[in-house]
Amino acid sequence: YNLVHNLTAKENVELAAQICSNPLDSETALDSVGLLERANNFPAQLSGGEQQRVSIARALAKRPKLLLCDEPTGALDYNTGRQILKLLQETCRKDKMTVVLITHNGAITPMADHIIRMKSGKIVEDIYNENPKNVEEIEW
């Protein structure tokens, strides 16, 4: 997750936010991924899923126009994965951020407004979903 190992979770988020003109507060970013209470822990003290959430908080703190998420729920349990997907969906809608989510979990595609399926490096399907579902409506 490319965390700096001698910096706390909070410091990792703050480090990324330093390059932005209007970053999200590091504590707000960590709270949004459910890790405010772990802000002063170092990466080695965090589980793989917690490290993944710190990296998501770090990305969100920069308030990007485009957020690339490669398997953002890969190291997360079901409930935490749902929380992160809900956060990404809400951030996308509220902040008008484009979120590109790469996943092997086809069951979550109904939440997307644009779905591109690939096989062997080639696009096999390109669909615009006029009625994306809220994460709460999806089961997998």
Q: Model-found features: residue ranges?
A:
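ABC family nucleotide-binding domain
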Residues: 1-118
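Conserved beta-strand-loop-alpha-helix hinge in the C-terminal portion
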Residues: 122-140
